């Protein structure tokens, strides 16, 4: 699991911690950090302003640029990018900057002095598979109000640090950044602050949900109308990049971000592409279907399917169907949050060779069903904020068992399992730091499993 410290800092203050020391503390509590490092690679990167750009006299593709890299400080840089032009704010690697491709130095390029390099996003060491095509094709042009001389990675929000955490099977809950935040808060002696989720007036829903297989223990669907498809905010795009997920658009990005934040996979359907406005979760299909990646797959009777209009709306927990996908013209959507059987999904995902981020959450048991309704509300709130959603409908869902589970354990059992000599107060302090609800009678703890 890739954990962004910038994202973690949204829930618990960690930006005053040395990342290496924080990684050691997290490892000591049983969450092994297997790798770590900065999100983007590069030192001495600043925001520059291209004051002048002319053609290189000895080249048919190079340009000679006069670039202001600090107030009143102009340097000449030779650049071969086709989209460089006067008046642009750009990312400049100063001499001495170390990028993945090597160290930048001053020198002569076809007889003209060049003191630095104007960069693309791709040259900053980000995973090329997660970048947009325009970020690979030429230099990255910054907004006009980008302050000249500012540290570029900080300005872009890419000065992040990533922990690669190897989660054992019993800690699948930490696939949710909010759960990881509680662990970090406990080890640092701090409090977690979760985002406030705004509730909106709701109209009676126009959709139906029917579950016809025991392999789906919960299914919730929420209709939201009036959305606009556009770019998601930069902070959200950066959070997804840091989590190893490619940003697509605000609708898709919100669904992926909510999964990263809460651990609950989200799928969205274009409501206007549905005829019957009903979702039937069942098995028994034996046909071919084109999914979101535009490839055709064999659907077998044992596969759990979210059926729409008697067809394949989604291979449950794995990938959505192509017929109901979100596109640039989408105005009305249905949000799905569900709990599917992990073993059944594992067989389907492996056969299709589609071990997606969503399927991994189901397979590893990261789903907290009791939080599913809250997750739908979180998703809705983000759609209002960043997709201009106008009309919200009631959530339609199958019965939800909200009985909280409890675990009873004696202090002697705790110490016997851990090989420790903890006192009642020490164990109580640990439960308090993790925000666990519990009762204590003599040395017997009854702990309510968190949700």
What are these regions, as identified by a protein language model?
Residues 1-198, 334, 350-355, 366-369, ...:
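Phosphate-backbone binding interfaces of nucleic-acid-interacting proteins
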Residues 399-451:
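Noncatalytic alpha-helical scaffolds and linker/capping helices
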Residues 122-123, 129, 141-142, 229, ...:
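Conserved catalytic alpha/beta cores of large enzymes that bind or transform nucleotide phosphates
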Residues 47-76, 255-323:
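Conserved mixed alpha/beta core segments that line enzyme active sites in large multi-domain catalysts
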Residues 40-46, 197-205, 254-261, 274-275, ...:
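A glycine-rich phosphate-binding loop feature that marks nucleotide/adenosyl-phosphate handling sites
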Residues 5, 24, 63, 188, ...:
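Glycine/proline-enriched, intrinsically flexible loops and inter-domain linkers
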Residues 19, 33-39, 191-200, 247-252, ...:
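Flexible, glycine/charged-enriched surface loops at secondary-structure junctions
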Residues 184-213, 387-414, 418-421:
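Terminal amphipathic helices with adjacent charged low-complexity linkers/tails
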